[in-house]
Regions:
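Predominantly late transmembrane helices and immediately cytosolic-facing juxtamembrane segments
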Residues: 139-145, 238, 247-264
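Hydrophobic core segments of alpha-helical transmembrane domains in multi-pass membrane proteins
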Residues: 68-78, 124-135, 243-255, 307-311
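Membrane-interface helix-loop-helix junctions at boundaries between adjacent transmembrane segments
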Residues: 91-101, 109-172, 183-189
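Alpha-helical transmembrane segments of multi-pass integral membrane proteins
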Residues: 131-135, 140, 156-178, 196-213, ...
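Hydrophobic, membrane-inserted alpha-helices
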Residues: 48-54, 106-115, 225-234
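N-terminal membrane topogenic signal
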Residues: 27-46
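Short aromatic-rich membrane-water interface segments that cap or initiate transmembrane helices
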Residues: 185-199, 308
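Short, hydrophobic transmembrane alpha-helix segments
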Residues: 53-67, 293-298
C-alpha cells in the first residue's frame, strides 16, 4: 500500500514522528488525482504545453533573442538554488574562524580551478562539467519508495539514467544545433566528438529512463513520473538550450531550493532570504565578470558561454564541498 497523506516534494523523503527520513512503502494503488502532482510538476507540465503551443504558432526557440533571454533565465532562476551552500560556511563559522576561512578558501579555490580549466582545456572542462551535472541531476530522480515485497528501494542506476538521457537526447533530436553549442562553449571544433558519444549513449539511457518513469508511476510516484515525461519530451521537442532551461529553471532549481529552505531552522529562515538574495547577486556579479572576459564573436555566443561557465563554477564546489566536509576525520 502507498502511505496516505500529501506526498512530499519529489526528491525528499517522508518524515517520521522522530523527525528522521524514512522510505515509503510502495504498492499497486495510485495517489488521488488531487494529490498526484506536486505544484512544481504541474507548473512544469503547463510550461511545456505552453512552449509547444508557442512553437506551433511560429515562435523560434533557437532565435538569438530567445536564446539570450533563456541564458539570462538560467542565471536569474538557476543561481538561487545553489546559494544554500552558505549553510556549510555558516556551520564552519560556528566551529571556529579557522574552519570558516578554510571552507571559504576551498570553495573559492574550486571555483577558480574550474574557471582556469575552461581557459586551459575547455573540452576537458566541458566534459567534466557534463559528468558532474549528471550526478548532480540524478538527485532529482532518486526514489525513497521501498519496492513491494522487498526491503530494497529502486536501483540507483535508474535515477542516473534520467540525467544521462536529459543531457544526451538533444544529440538525436537537434544534432547540428548541439554541435554548434559545444563548439561555441569550447572554442574548439573538436568538441563535436562529445556529440558523437552522446548519440551512442542516448538510446540506451532513454530506454532505462523510460523504464524508470513507468516504475515511478506503478509505485505511486506519479508526480516524479510525469515530470520525467515532461523533461524528456522537452529535450526532444525544444531546441537544446530551451529544453535544458525548462528543466533547470522550472524543475531542478525549485526542487532543490524548496528542499534547502525546508532544512532551515526558524532562526535561520528569518535572515536566509537576505543571504540568498545577496549570494545570488554575488553569483550574477561573477557572471558579469565571466561575460566581460568572454572571447565569443557574438553577444549570443558570449551569453551562452557565460551562463554555462558560471553554472559550472558554482556546480563544482556545490557538489564537492559537502562530501569533503562530511568526511569523518576532515578538519573542515
Amino acid at each position: 500500500m502507498v502511505v496516505t497523506g500529501s506526498p512530499p516534494i519529489p526528491g525528499t523523503a517522508a518524515v517520521t514522528s522522530a523527525g528522521l527520513s524514512a522510505p515509503r512503502q510502495s504498492g499497486r494503488s495510485f495517489a488521488s488525482a488531487e494529490n498526484a502532482f506536486s505544484p512544481i510538476t504541474r507548473f512544469l507540465a503547463f510550461a511545456l504545453l505552453s512552449c509547444v503551443g508557442l512553437q506551433a504558432l511560429g515562435l523560434d526557440f533557437a532565435d538569438e533573442t530567445v536564446t539570450q533571454t533563456l541564458c539570462a533565465a538560467l542565471l536569474l532562476l538557476g543561481l538561487p538554488h545553489g546559494t544554500f551552500d552558505w549553510q556549510l560556511l555558516h556551520a564552519g563559522l560556528q566551529r571556529s574562524i579557522y574552519t570558516f576561512a578554510l571552507r571559504l578558501g576551498l570553495y573559492l579555490g574550486l571555483a577558480a580551478a574550474t574557471y582556469l580549466a575552461w581557459q586551459i582545456a575547455p573540452i576537458a572542462a566541458l566534459t567534466i562539467f557534463l559528468l558532474i551535472a549528471i550526478f548532480h541531476f540524478a538527485e532529482d530522480w532518486e526514489s525513497d519508495v521501498i519496492l513491494a515485497n522487498s526491503s530494497a528501494t529502486k536501483p540507483k542506476f535508474l535515477a542516473l539514467a534520467m540525467p544521462i538521457s536529459i543531457i544526451t537526447l538533444p544529440a538525436l533530436s537537434h544534432q547540428e544545433m548541439l554541435r554548434s553549442i559545444f563548439v561555441m562553449l569550447s572554442g574548439d571544433e573538436s568538441a563535436v566528438m562529445l556529440v558523437d558519444v552522446m548519440i551512442l549513449l542516448a538510446p540506451v539511457a532513454t530506454g532505462v529512463a523510460t523504464a524508470k518513469i513507468f516504475m515511478d508511476c506503478a509505485t505511486g510516484e506519479i508526480s516524479r513520473g510525469i515530470a520525467g515525461i515532461c523533461v524528456l519530451s522537452a529535450m526532444v521537442i525544444l531546441p537544446p538550450i530551451a529544453g535544458f532551461s525548462l528543466y533547470f529553471c522550472l524543475y531542478h532549481s525549485p526542487l532543490h531550493f524548496s528542499t534547502g529552505w525546508k532544512q532551515l531552522t526558524v532562526d535561520q529562515a528569518k535572515y536566509s532570504a537576505l543571504i540568498v538574495a545577496g549570494l545570488t547577486i554575488g553569483g550574477l556579479a561573477i557572471a558579469a565578470l565571466v561575460y566581460s572576459f568572454g572571447q565569443g564573436s557574438t553577444v549570443t555566443g558570449n551569453l551562452v558561454a557565460t551562463a554555462f561557465v558560471t553554472l559550472s563554477l558554482l556546480t563544482v564546489p556545490h557538489m564537492i564541498m559537502p562530501s569533503l566536509v562530511s568526511r569523518r576525520h576532515s578538519s573542515l
